[in-house]
Amino acid sequence: FHNYIGVMKGSKYPDEYVVCGSHLDSYSYSGMCPGADDNATGVASVIETARILSQYSFERSIIYCAFGAEEIGLVGSSAYADYCAEVGMNIVGYFNNDMNGYLNPGDEIHIDLIYPNSVAPIGDYYMNVANVYFPEMQVRHVNFQAGDSDHTSFNLNGYMGIYPFEDYQNYSPYIHTGNDLIGPSVNSFEMSQRYTQMNVACVSTLALLDSESVSENEMSSVTMFPNPAQNTLELTSEYSGNNKVQIISSLGQIVKEF
């Protein structure tokens, strides 16, 4: 029933928090509960997001969570969200990670975004970020009545939390069974990757990248013209021999390499 919490303190607004969470417990009606999709995929997304973003500093603090006992009533996340509200923590957004590895055969990768209308601003924010990085991907707001997840614990405490889900109609038929395994239940690593990429994009954008955490030492002998540039950029280096250039976005994505 334990929760595991990791905090990256913000450099400018340490008392404003962006929270990224998942549940680490698994449940099965048959006794065997491997939990590959529900919810190893969500935990993996949180860990990978933390790994990538740990290389940078952000103006707001980021909290990474792995909650216990979600399957028996959101126990771990309820306790934590209740505590956050009790001490007056300013959580600007919660991003839930729960089941992102099953793609219904024949479907294209998409995201079903679950949230109540009361937190529509963060739902709109998620869709706007998706439109920037993956404009071809469908993201649809849905109301899911057949189950619940840890975002609700934050919503009930007045925080804005959303739940990107694999498919509210055609989610893995193998969850809560001994067949929740890689293969039948987690059948699309590409979809898990896409959900994790969206996690990284949304968390890092809302947390506000601290530009000072991006080292410019290596650029001291390189000039750029014009700066900023729109269509054409000329780089001049004092280094002789072969030079390798990478253009990297603020989210750590390699945009161009030559």
List the predicted regions and their residue ranges:
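C-terminal outer-membrane/trafficking sorting elements
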Residues: 217-258
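Solvent-exposed loop/turn segments at secondary-structure junctions
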Residues: 11-13, 24-28, 68-73, 98-103, ...
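Low-complexity, Pro/Thr/Ser/Gly/Ala-rich linker/spacer regions in secreted
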Residues: 207-220
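Active-site-adjacent substrate-binding region
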Residues: 102-210
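Short beta-strand/loop motifs in extracellular/secreted proteins, especially
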Residues: 16, 60, 241-245
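Short beta-strand element of the alpha/beta-hydrolase
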Residues: 17-21
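Acidic/histidine-rich catalytic neighborhood of metal-dependent amide-processing enzymes
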Residues: 1, 28-118
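A non-catalytic alpha/beta surface segment that caps or lines the substrate-entry region
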Residues: 1-8
